[in-house]
Curated annotation (Swiss-Prot):
Gene Ontology molecular-function annotations: succinate-CoA ligase (ADP-forming) activity; succinate-CoA ligase (GDP-forming) activity
InterPro entries: CoA-bd, SUCC_ACL_C, Succinyl-CoA_synth-like
Entries under NCBIfam families matching the protein: PRK06091.1
Highest taxon listed in the record's lineage: Bacteria
Biological process annotations from GO: tricarboxylic acid cycle
Provenance organism: Escherichia coli (strain K12)
Name of the protein in question: Uncharacterized protein YahF
One Pfam family in the UniProt entry: Ligase_CoA
Family statement drawn from the similarity comment of this UniProt entry: Belongs to the AllF family.
Length: 515
């Protein structure tokens, strides 16, 4: 094995840039494996697991950049290094910035009218940069993760005192005055404001609102821990107030994974007091509360979008609600062999994984996952599926030192082949997320592997059902229609929404009396 190691002292690049560069580096001819990352302890741990950690790399400091190249046999590592370093130059030249500043303070001084900072830095420095932005009267979207709960609480308290947004940490989705930040979809402007403690959940809600003829005024992300007991929903509470006073917003929709009970009560109390109608979608398996005056509840993202657009004036009778295709369900059941009884979910989006998993759990037992709220059914080994298994490839379990699957789907692609070889698997469920920040061709990057997976099953005399959901709109690039057609041409069954994905998957595998 021929390995080239370069350490660039005090050379910082944000995680989003490094994810993109690392993905492109691994596609270069002659590269067996390339690792481009900051020298954090977490990233060193990844190198150790790969057998690439050397004493030299071990001594590198957090602010140092590591480039590790494992070239294929006969490859020239020096030339590969030149090509990888050129990727940094391309990244710098393609940026839309007009100037560079050493600090947030100096940027604010030169652009005094600016009011928002998007921060993606090493988690060790993220709180410091976010605090500096808030002190300069800037709203903050903090993409960085690995920020302590204590720092998050302090930042959100400071933002609250100053009347500013503190979106994050680990906030990946927002739409502010029509501009999508980090991950987001091209949706029409409208009068529905979204507050989301869930990235892909917020994207899904915005996309369904768009499909149903509504539009989005603002989408404010809070970060996934906002509704925890320690944070207390500070950002969601403040965001409700901001949207209540936003002249562009007439309806407010809230979405989150299950919040802490005390925080849920606090948020609902604030929602009841809001002068504008509020739709609440807290994804879980519990009973959906009864609607109240000015406050409506939704069991899933599709229902939340429907209620929001109806409040905005859209008539339900004019909508295609995509009811389940019963003839299709019967046909799929007939095509499965008796031993095929399990669902395997391979997801990029955490909320999409949750919503599908919860739907299956309503009808079937033995549902395992790396994000299962029930410890009894949380996977002990994420590399081995058990019975019904749902994997969130965007969780830290899989992204530790690696790009998010919405940017680089490599991890999920290899797992697809592994699951296809299991004769007890009936259905594999996959999501494909379009939009700003995502892979430029998510379906195209996976389609050949999908064909290979189906061929593996066919060679053993069984049919592997692949059920896919494409999260996107007609305005996204690539388009929803183009990506969907590629899947249909490969014999993949398409679901029309995240909600319908779970409902279809659970029905496909029903046998005997269950059916």
């Amino acid at each position: 094995m021929s390995v080239k190691i370069v350490i660039k002292p005090n050379t910082y690049f944000d995680s989003v840039s490094l994810m993109s560069i690392s993905t492109r580096a691994n596609k270069l001819d002659g590269v067996e494996q390339a690792f481009v990352a900051m020298a954090t302890e977490m990233n060193k741990g990844v190198l150790k697991n790969l057998g690439l950690l050397t004493p030299e790399l071990e001594q590198a400091k957090n602010g140092d950049l590591m480039i590790v190249i494992n070239g294929k046999s006969g490859a020239d590592n020096e030339q590969l290094l030149v090509e990888i370093e050129e990727l940094f130059n391309t990244k710098a030249q393609s940026g839309s910035h007009e100037a560079r500043y050493a600090t947030i303070g100096s940027a604010k001084k030169h652009i005094p009218e600016s009011n928002l900072a998007v921060i993606s830095v090493n988690g060790l420095f993220a709180a410091r940069e976010a605090r500096q932005a808030l002190q300069n009267d800037l709203n903050v979207m903090l993409f960085s993760d690995n920020v302590s709960v204590e720092d998050e609480l302090a930042l959100k308290q400071l933002a609250h005192e100053k009347g500013l947004l503190m979106m994050g940490p680990d906030c990946g989705t927002a739409i502010i005055n029509g501009a999508a930040l980090c991950f987001g979809n091209a949706v029409r402007r409208g009068n529905i404001g979204i507050v989301g403690a869930s990235g892909t959940g917020s994207q899904e809600l915005s996309v369904r609102i768009h499909e149903f003829g509504g539009g989005v005024s603002q989408l404010i992300g809070t970060g996934g821990r906002d509704l925890s007991e320690k944070i207390g929903g500070l950002m969601m509470l403040d965001a409700i107030g901001m949207l209540e006073n936003d002249p562009q917003t007439e309806i407010i929709a809230l979405i989150s994974k299950p919040p802490a009970p005390a925080v849920a009560r606090k948020v609902l109390e604030r929602a009841r007091a809001c002068r504008k109608p509020v739709v609440v979608c807290f994804l879980d398996r519990g009973e959906t509360p009864v609607d109240e005056q000015g406050l409506q509840f939704a069991r899933g993202t599709k229902e939340a979008a429907l209620k929001a657009v109806m409040l905005s004036g859209v008539k339900q009778e004019n909508l295609d609600l995509h009811t389940l295709n019963q003839p299709l369900i019967a046909d799929v059941r007939a095509r499965l062999q008796p031993q095929q009884k399990y669902i395997r979910g391979l997801f990029c989006g955490g909320t999409l994984c949750d919503e599908t998993m919860f739907a299956v759990m309503e009808k079937h037992g033995d549902v395992y996952s790396n994000i299962q709220p029930d410890p009894e059914f949380r996977l002990k080994d994420i590399n081995r599926s058990i019975k019904h298994t749902f994997l969130d490839f965007g969780d830290d379990d899989f992204t530790n030192g690696k790009p998010h699957p919405m940017i680089d789907p490599t991890n999920r692609i290899s797992r697809l082949i592994e699951e296809a070889r299991d004769p007890e698997v009936a259905v594999i469920v996959m999501d494909f997320v379009l939009g700003f920040g995502s892979h430029e061709d998510p379906v195209g990057s996976t389609i050949e592997t999908i064909k290979e997976a189906k061929a593996i099953a066919a060679a053993e005399g069984r049919e592997l059902i692949i059920l896919a959901y494409v999260l996107g709109t007609d305005l996204d690039t690539p388009s929803l229609e183009q990506q969907s057609q590629m899947l249909l041409d490969a014999g993949v069954i398409l679901a029309s929404s995240s909600t319908n994905t779970g409902l279809l998957a659970r029905e496909f595998i029903c046998k005997g009396e269950e059916a």
